[in-house]
């Protein structure tokens, strides 16, 4: 991945809250020149006592120029950027001496790379030397267990000898087996057990797919699924993406099934958005449409803690 900067149609410097980490904040206090002065005038204190950079009335970061390039980057280099600007579109989870990282679909260049691939997603392991953080309360056995869960669930999703619906059935069944194993203290951790009784893809579809209750949209969805524009591999890739992103969170709250359901639900929402775009396009849906739909969903839902928590609450309490 490489940022396409000014060529990006939906800049990450537009429409986002831009936080400033403490080290960057202290550095900006001493940054010389017009850029430093403009930056300091645009900084503010957030409600939680941190700091951020203001945006203008159009939602553009005050450091974003008319060529959609960052004046701070131009003046002081990449090292001058705050953590949130340096890290995006990367995100990750850390436990023991492991950090899992992925690229977010909220970035249009990531979407282009992601949906241009037809082969199953592969994950790269790399050993880095240096001091690691503490174990964060996670034992070696727990880490190994949840890594097995993640690997096994992704392997089920990537078995292209079976239709995607069958794979999702098996995926949810296997996640339930792991949840039961966890509740039986095969891994020593206290959990709040959540009971799920119905794991079929069909019933899951009915529960969360409002379109099934709306005659017009149901026909739109069926037309989309029957069209040559529907790509089952895209659905697989999305399921794998959400599983990689969310399942390992269970290492801290033990709710494997919640994150498995969340991964399927988010994929289905994107699929339903695809069908709506198909209808609005007059019966066509391109890879560019898929990229835009996924980007919009990721930006508005994935990157909103409130929206993700609301989805989890819907799953838990239904």
Language-model regions, residue ranges each:
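A structured, charge-rich N-terminal accessory region that forms the first stable segment of a protein
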Residues: 10-45
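Immediate flanking context of iron-sulfur cluster ligation sites
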Residues: 1-8, 42-82, 99
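Short, compositionally biased low-complexity segments
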Residues: 1-7, 120-125, 238-243
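Internal, well-ordered alpha/beta segment that forms a basic, Gly-enriched binding/recognition surface
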Residues: 68, 75-169
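Short runs of predominantly hydrophobic/aromatic residues within well-ordered alpha helices
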Residues: 5, 9, 146, 150, ...
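General secretory precursor processing signal
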Residues: 6, 11, 15-16, 64, ...
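Hydrophobic, aromatic-lined core segments that form the binding pocket/scaffold
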Residues: 161-318
């Amino acid at each position: 991945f490489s940022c396409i900067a000014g060529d990006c149609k939906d800049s990450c410097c537009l429409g986002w809250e831009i936080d400033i980490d403490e080290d960057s904040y202290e550095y900006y206090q001493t940054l010389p020149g017009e850029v430093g002065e403009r930056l300091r005038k645009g900084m503010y204190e957030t409600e939680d006592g941190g700091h951020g950079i203001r945006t203008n009335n159009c939602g553009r970061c005050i450091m974003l120029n008319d060529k959609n390039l960052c004046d701070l980057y131009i003046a002081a280099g990449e090292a001058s950027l705050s953590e949130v600007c340096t890290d995006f579109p990367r995100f990750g989870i850390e436990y023991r001496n492991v950090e899992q990282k992925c690229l977010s679909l909220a970035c249009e260049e990531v979407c282009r790379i992601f949906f241009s691939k037809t082969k199953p997603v592969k994950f790269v392991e790399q050993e880095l030397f240096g001091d690691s953080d503490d174990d964060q309360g996670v034992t070696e056995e727990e880490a190994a267990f949840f890594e097995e869960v993640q690997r096994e669930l992704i392997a089920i999703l990537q078995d292209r000898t079976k239709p995607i619906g069958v794979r999702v059935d098996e995926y949810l069944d296997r996640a339930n087996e792991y949840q039961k194993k966890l509740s039986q203290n095969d891994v020593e951790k206290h959990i709040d057990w959540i009971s799920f009784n119905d794991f079929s893809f069909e019933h899951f579809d009915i529960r969360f797919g409002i379109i099934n209750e709306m005659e017009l949209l149901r026909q739109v969805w069926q037309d989309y699924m029957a069209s040559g524009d529907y790509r089952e591999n895209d659905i697989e890739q999305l399921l794998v993406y959400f599983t990689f992103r969310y399942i390992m969170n269970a290492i801290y709250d033990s709710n494997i099934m919640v994150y498995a359901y969340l991964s399927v639900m988010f994929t289905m929402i994107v699929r339903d958005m695809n069908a709506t775009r198909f209808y609005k396009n007059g019966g066509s849906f391109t890879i560019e449409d898929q990229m835009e739909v996924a980007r919009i969903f990721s930006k508005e839902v994935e990157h909103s803690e409130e929206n993700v928590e609301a989805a989890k609450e819907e799953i838990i309490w239904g």
